[in-house]
Design a protein with these regions (language model features):
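Short terminal alpha-helical segments
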Residues: 1-34
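Short amphipathic alpha-helical heptad-repeat segments
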Residues: 5-12, 58-66
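Alpha-helical repeat scaffolds in large eukaryotic proteins
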Residues: 18-21, 37-46, 67, 71-74, ...
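Amphipathic alpha-helical interaction modules
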Residues: 21-61
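Amphipathic alpha-helical binding modules
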Residues: 62-98
């Protein structure tokens, strides 16, 4: 089953962040590690990471979509500390991607 933003935004976000972290051609190692850390935090919160492609082959668009997916979560789920920490790490990675 493929991660779907509508049915499981947590897993979709984690999968996108994992894909960005795995992109060794476009993403510098330090930013990749931030994305992998964010994906790991989301897995701790219950996400199931799957291999999915980057959105349009673009790491920046993929991180932005992951953050958008987290915004679809209900308030209680988003307030979970690992989810908040993952959102912060993703935001920091997005900023550094330029």
């Amino acid at each position: 089953m493929t991660a779907d933003v509508a049915s499981d935004p947590l897993s979709y976000a984690a999968s996108l962040l994992d894909a960005v972290g795995a992109d060794r051609e476009q993403v510098p190692a330090d930013i990749a590690l931030e994305c992998l850390y964010a994906a790991e935090l989301l897995e701790l919160a219950g996400a199931r990471t799957e291999r999915i492609p980057l959105i349009g082959g673009d790491p920046r668009a993929s991180v932005r979509a992951a953050i958008g997916a987290l915004g679809l979560m209900d308030e209680a789920a988003f307030a979970n500390p690992p989810v908040l920490d993952a959102a912060r790490a993703a935001r920091h990675a997005l900023r550094r991607l330029g």
